[in-house]
Amino acid sequence: MPNTYDFFKKGTICTNTFSCSEWTFPSLATYESGLDTLGHMMFHNTIDGELPQSVPTLTEYIKGKGYFTSKLDGDWRCIYSYGFARGCDQYVYQIQSMGARAEQEIINAIEHIEAFKDTDQYLWMTVGDLHDIADGYDLSLAVQKNLTLDELEYEDAGKTSVKQNYSWGKSQRYKKTIQYFDMLFGILYNYIERNYKDNEIVISLFADHGQGYLVPNDKHFLSKERTKVAFMFRGSNVDEKISDEIISTADYLPIMCKLCDIQVDYEKINGRLPLSFGGEKERKYAITESIHPGDKYCAVANADDYEIYFDNQALTDEEGRFELKDYKVYGYYKDGTNIEDKALLDKYEKIFMERIAEHVIYD
């Protein structure tokens, strides 16, 4: 993504950021609330949830600072009834396929910024076209014309967009769609640079999760291809650097509030301000977890030199609770070798057990 790199290399690009969840509904709730999945419990795929009223949302924090707040969205997993309209002065929602595709939303964003140019404004824009690959939808003609027949070959969409097996074809479609995205976003980047100085803006770009069809068949469900995400910032008070600090997506709210000079109540959230953005210390690990009714709970702790997994064998119920049954704690170093250090594994077993204690069904 040359346009994206050229734009954000003048800010901070974070290369070790991990999503708290592996799919959109809980992941976007984390970005807006600063809570991890077990904190906000918006995890159920068929029962709607709502952002907890006990914590301010990012939009509410920014609204309280005096900004005109807006949301342009085509993603049905972060709609107003889920609490994402809290703090919004203007909320524009359209089903992605009916008017909120990338090429439309980017122009909508420019139009919005122009319309409210005399105000201090905050704009959240969601572009979800990459989801079309997992969902099996037709891609833009501009993408299709760059794909071979082999890369366009029909494949089963899978049980859900989350539970995707590795696919070479989908991987190629993913890469070509990202290249198309970068071309489109270049229009927005150019507009911003022509109209604003860096001390007048704070721009962030992030992804909610990775992709299952990028995970090799011999790797864990929560491997980095599914959990590591794009995460970058540019503008006022943003240093120019590449950061390899371990960061959780729960840290997004603290980062944005720091850049906007807003005080955060850290006692109520899981997010922390990374050292790269002025925090006091680095995270030693970031946890991603998968919790679905009818599925087995699993989690991974990603650290600098290793990744450690927790796999439970009992199924999760409709309330997000489960019995502990034949669970395993194991991990791998960066070079792929097994972790045999019992003290290290015991340490993370305790960390995982403390996290899930309130969700375990005890005899």
Regions found by a protein language model. Give the residues of each.
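Catalytic domains that recognize anionic headgroups
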Residues: 1-363
